[in-house]
C-alpha cells in the first residue's frame, strides 16, 4: 500500500529504502506489484542477504548494502518516497531503531509526501502494549499515523507521514 500513498508519482519515479532487508519478502512483493520502482535495502548480516537471494528469490536488481540501518541513515543524504523499517533483533525492533531520534532521522530522509512503514511482527491489544508505545513514539514525530492488521498473519503495519492525504488511501 505504501507506494500507492505517494501522490501524483509514477512508480518508475519513486524510490524506496528498506531498513532490515531480512529475507527480502517486502522487496519481492513490491517488485511484483510496483516493478519499476527503484528499491534498495540495508541488512546488517551479509549471510542473510546471501540466503535471501538463494532461497527466497530476492530480485537481483534490488541493491542491498551490508550495514547497520541507523548508521546508514546517518551516513547518507538521499531522500526517499517510502522507507520501510523491518529490522529485528530476535522478535523485537532494536532499541536504537525505535526511538524518537531514530524516527526523526527517518523523517529527514523522506520526501515531503513520503511515507514510513514499520512492520510490527506482533499484534497487541489493550493499554500498555509494545505496539501502542511504538505508535505513540512515532506519533510524536509524524503528523499522521495509521496501523493496519495484515490478514492471515500476526503482523501489523504502521504507516506514518506528515501528508494528511495519505490516510485516504488506507480507508
Language model features by range: what are they?
Residues 1-117, 121, 125-135, 139-141, ...:
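The AdoMet/dcAdoMet-binding core of the Class I SAM-like
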Residues 1, 5-7, 144-171:
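Soluble small-group transferase modules, centered on the S-adenosyl donor enzyme superfamily
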Amino acid at each position: 500500500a505504501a507506494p500507492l500513498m505517494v501522490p501524483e508519482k509514477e512508480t518508475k519515479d519513486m524510490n524506496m529504502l528498506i531498513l532490515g532487508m531480512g529475507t527480502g519478502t517486502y522487496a519481492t512483493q513490491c517488485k511484483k506489484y510496483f516493478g519499476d520502482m527503484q528499491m534498495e535495502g540495508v541488512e546488517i548480516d551479509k549471510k542473510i542477504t546471501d540466503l535471501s537471494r538463494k532461497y527466497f528469490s530476492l530480485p537481483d536488481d534490488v541493491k542491498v548494502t551490508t550495514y547497520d540501518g541507523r548508521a546508514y541513515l546517518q551516513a547518507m543524504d538521499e531522500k526517499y518516497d517510502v522507507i520501510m523499517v523491518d529490522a529485528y533483533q530476535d522478535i523485537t525492533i532494536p532499541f536504537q531503531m525505535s526511538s524518537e531520534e531514530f524516527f526523526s532521522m527517518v523523517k529527514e530522509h523522506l520526501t515531503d509526501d513520503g511515507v514510513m512503514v514499520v512492520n510490527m511482527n506482533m499484534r497487541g491489544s489493550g493499554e500498555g502494549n509494545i505496539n501502542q508505545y511504538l505508535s505513540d513514539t512515532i506519533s510524536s514525530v509524524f503528523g499522521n499515523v495509521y496501523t493496519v492488521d495484515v490478514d492471515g498473519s500476526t503482523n501489523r503495519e504502521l504507516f506514518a507521514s506528515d501528508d494528511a492525504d495519505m490516510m485516504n488511501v488506507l480507508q
